[in-house]
Design a protein with these regions (language model features):
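Positively charged n-region of N-terminal signal peptides that target proteins for export
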Residues: 1-4
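Bacterial N-terminal signal peptides
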Residues: 6-15
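Boundary at the C-terminal end of the N-terminal hydrophobic targeting segment
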Residues: 17-19
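Short structural boundary motif marking the start of a folded domain
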Residues: 22-29
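Extracellular beta-rich ligand/substrate-recognition surface
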Residues: 30-37
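Cytochrome P450 core scaffold surrounding the K-helix E-X-X-R motif
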Residues: 65-71
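NAD(P)H dinucleotide-binding glycine-rich loop of Rossmann-like/cofactor-binding domains
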Residues: 116-184
């Protein structure tokens, strides 16, 4: 746990510039095997789309689901694995069609980061049953972005559709908000 906290603190103070039209560089903590320890990991997230927001992560909770997935106890974990689906942070950039957020707003992310938004289930707010397949925060094939494997919130940033982010009041204590996002 001390190792994880030390690495998270180091990531918080590292500087990354954001690409406008390209993939977003990210730094996180990853497991490279089910028996490994967290290690620093540099990767990239998909480019910020017209309906996406880029969140600078302030806090990410640790859920037992992260432990199960990281140890591949549910099977088929892809490594390197960056866990974390209880994400609270500040909006750093918005796509041109974003209406729910502005730069500087607090935002949260739960366990689902994308769905088609068009099928009957999505229209009823049941994105977890998206007929085209929902995209999870980590370890999920993102079929909306070249089928890349999603990486979670044990990182410095996250790109997410505005429809799958939650606006957090500016007076919220963000370290207490992150664990509330466990259920998405």
């Amino acid at each position: 746990m001390k190792q994880l906290l030390s690495l998270l603190i180091a990531l918080t103070f590292s500087s990354i510039s954001y690409a406008q039209d390209n993939r977003v560089p990210s730094k996180g903590l990853a497991l490279f095997s089910k028996d490994g320890n967290f290690e620093p990991y540099e990767f990239s997230r998909h480019a910020i789309g017209d309906n996406d927001i880029l969140i600078d992560i302030l806090y990410s909770g640790i859920c037992h689901s992260d432990i199960h997935a990281g140890r591949s106890e549910w099977g088929n974990t892809s490594y390197p694995f960056v866990g974390g689906h209880e994400i609270a942070g500040r909006v750093a950039q918005t796509g041109k069609n974003v209406t729910k957020f502005k730069v500087g707003d607090y935002a949260g992310i739960g366990c689902i980061i994308n769905s088609c938004g068009q099928c009957d289930n999505c229209k009823q707010g049941l994105e977890q049953f998206c007929e085209k397949g929902m995209v999870g925060t980590y370890g999920s094939h993102d079929h909306f972005h070249d089928n890349e494997i999603t990486q979670g919130g044990y990182a410095n940033n996250y790109v997410v559709s505005e429809n799958h982010a939650i606006k957090i009041p500016q007076n919220a204590d963000m370290k207490r908000v992150a664990p509330l996002l466990c259920a998405g």
